[in-house]
Each structure stands twice: as C-alpha cells, then as structure tokens.
A protein has these predicted regions:
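PP2C/PPM-type serine/threonine phosphatase catalytic domain
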Residues: 1-279
C-alpha cells in the first residue's frame, strides 16, 4: 500500500516527485522532493509496516502551502507548511482521519495564525472530539440495526499517535501526542537533537497525571524458557495504561479507553499535545 506523500489536501498545490526511488526491506517506496518551497529546501517520506504484519497503519501528511480558509483574511495569512506522521494502532481509521483533517482543524481556529500554540491545542481537541463522535454514532447505529446491546465487535477501536511540525514564516512549532519522535540533524549530521518527548506511562510527568485521574499503570510478565535450557526467566513487557491497555499515555481515538459508556476515562489517555517552539 503506497502511503508516501499523499495528495495535497483541500486544494493545496502538489509538487512533482522524483520518479526514482529506493526500495528498502519491509518499507514502502521511499520518495523525495525535487522542488522546495520557501525555507523548505527538500523533504522525503517513508513508512515501514514492520516484520510481523502484512498491513500498514501509519500515515503521512506533507502540505507545503496550507490553503487559506475563505473566512480568513488574505492580508494576515502567513506562509505555512505542515508535516505530520500519524502512527496508527488498532486499525487505520483514526490515522486516516487525522491525515485528511487535522491541519484544517488547526488553521480554522480563531486563534490561527495570531496564536499558533493555542490553535494547535484547540484544533487537536476538536479533531479528537469529532472523531470520537463519528465512531460512537456509527457503533450506536450498527447496534440498533442488529438489536444488540453489547458493543463488542461494533466499535472502531483504532487510535493514533501524532507528531506534527508546523512551520509559519521562520518559526517551527512541534506538537506531539504519543511516542512518535521529531529529531533534528545539525552540524552536518554530527549532532542529533530531540525536538519532542515520548509520552509513556512510566515517564514521571505522565505517571503522576494518570494516577491522579484514577488510571492504573501496569507491566505484563511472561515466563519463557532460557536459551541455555537451564530453566525459565521472566520477561517484562512495556508499561501499559488502564483503561485502554495502551503502551502510550497520549493518543487520538482509542474510544474504549476514553468514553465512560465503554469503560473508559477521558482524563487518563488524552490527546493534549506537548508543544515546543523553535526560531
């Protein structure tokens, strides 16, 4: 499945991609730009479905020039580019929704472009609410048609992490939900700088927030034979959050982890972004 550099959404002008590409094991086809835009000199994208799956839940957005909503002033509209990776899990529906819509939720906020961090927070919240409402309504309708009261098998449990880079004029805004990472290469590749922080259940800030909101953090244990045949050993799995059983503490979607009617808690696994600004 080709998920690399999807069409430029909502009327945004696309740029020609070099037909030459590199094939990597277990990766989709890697593609790169032959033309930049403003301070963006080049860009590239690639996703990897992994070794154990025959499907890919990751999605990519690359929009070099976000289209100005009609109700926004042309005079105040800046040059803005949007790059995002959506690391889907439990299905691709949530990642698909974010790829197609998240940038529009951000730029349509009243606070955009005067206050980009506020617009990002508000846009993320609206996108989350909209997606959960779609999933809930679809499940309710399907259950009603079948006369079913148990939601098992009727609810779209997909979710997604998100790492977003929004470039407005000369400022870079990095917004993170989950454990997808943004890094920056500097000094000719000799230095690598982290631009985001992973949202993991066992990370101190996240652990405090989870437990204060009545969530639980646990770690699975698996007993396996030792390689040398001398007995067994205990293998610890990743830290996870209940409700949700996720190994990340922030995500979009994941309705069963969030809506009380499905046993969730909206304050435990959240879609609140952590935002960093770079000049």
């Amino acid at each position: 499945m080709n998920l690399i550099v999807e069409s430029f959404l909502e009327g945004d002008e696309g740029y020609c991609l070099d037909p030459d590409h590199v094939i990597l094991p277990n990766h989709d086809e890697a593609r790169h730009s032959t033309k930049g835009s403003g301070m963006i000199q080049a860009y590239a994208a690639n996703t990897n479905q992994g070794v154990f799956r025959n499907y890919n839940e990751d999605r990519v957005s690359i929009i070099l020039n976000i289209t100005r909503p009609k109700f926004k002033s042309e005079e105040d509209w800046p040059t803005c580019s949007f790059f995002a990776v959506y690391d889907g899990h439990g299905g691709a529906s949530c990642a698909d929704f974010l790829r197609d819509n998240l940038h529009q939720f951000i730029v349509k906020q009243e606070s955009f472009p005067s206050d980009p961090p506020a617009a990002i927070r508000e846009g993320f919240a609206e996108a989350e609410s909209f997606f959960l409402e779609i999933v809930e309504n679809a499940a309710d309708e399907a259950m009603a048609e079948q006369g079913e009261t148990n939601h098992d098998g009727y609810v779209d449990n997909s979710g997604s992490c998100a790492i977003v880079i929004l470039i407005i004029n000369q400022k870079v805004y990095v917004a993170n939900v989950g454990d997808s990472r943004a890094i920056m290469s500097a000094n000719g590749g000799r230095d690598v700088l982290s631009l985001s922080r992973d949202h993991k259940p066992n990370e101190e800030v996240e652990a405090v927030r989870i437990t204060e909101n009545r969530g639980k953090i646990y770690q699975t244990q698996t007993i396996v034979p030792k390689m040398d045949g001398t007995g067994n050993e205990c293998i610890l799995g990743p830290h996870r959050v209940f409700p949700g059983r996720l190994s990340v503490s922030r995500s979009f979607g994941d309705i069963e982890a969030k809506l009380p009617k499905y046993g969730g808690n909206m304050q435990v696994i959240v879609s609140v972004p952590e935002i960093r600004v770079f000049d």
